[in-house]
Structures are given as structure tokens and as C-alpha cells.
Amino acid sequence: SVDLTKNAGVRCVNFNEADLITCFANDYGFEKWVEKAVEFYGDEGDVLIVISSSGSSENMLNGIKAARNGNLKSVITLSGFDEHNPLRQLGDINLWVDSRAYNFVENIHQVWLLAIVDLIIGSREYSV
């Protein structure tokens, strides 16, 4: 998220701060922490990227529901495992890895995220 903000001027935040997760999970329950983060930090017109290896993490599914209720522009999902996982059913753009191996799914997700950043800032940074 820092690369998008710094290099592309795109306001971008991530919800992987330990204090945010701990506070919201303690106060609202683990299943609701992403939902609450989206409610507090998401603005109308934002894009939410949701990542779940299995595509069935309840906290992530609730985050998407909050995005829909908060009028975020779109939801991009990255998942793996079952092709018909619940996460994939809720996104506007869905990237899916055909594997049940966590390490493989997570590594492919990382490559895709880096590719998205490169597509957005690439013309400014690279001559290729």
C-alpha cells in the first residue's frame, strides 16, 4: 500500500496492523474486525482488495458486506482452494489460484499484488 501512495499518489491503506486487528477483534469479535475496519476507514468510491487463501474466512466475507453497505466502488478478491468459494461469489473482480496448498496460493497472491502495483505505477517508473 505504501508504494501506491508514495509512487502513484493513490490513497491506500492496509489492515494488517497488530493493534488494529487486536483492538477490533477484542471489541467486536474476530468475525467482525474486517467489517469494522471497512466501516471506519472505507470511503464511498474506494476499492477494497480482500485476500483469503480458502475464500471462506468469515471475517473477510463480513468485510465485503460492509463494503457493499458503505457504497465502496468495487471489491477485488484473491483466493484459492475451491473454485466456488464464497469470497469469489462476492467480488466484482476475482483472482483465484487453483491449488489447496497455502504456500503456493499465498505466493501467487503476492505476485499478483506486485503486478497490480507495477501496472499502476509502471509507466512512471519503468522505461519498458
Each model region followed by its residue ranges:
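Glycine-rich phosphate-binding loops that contact phosphosugars or nucleotide phosphates
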Residues: S1-V128
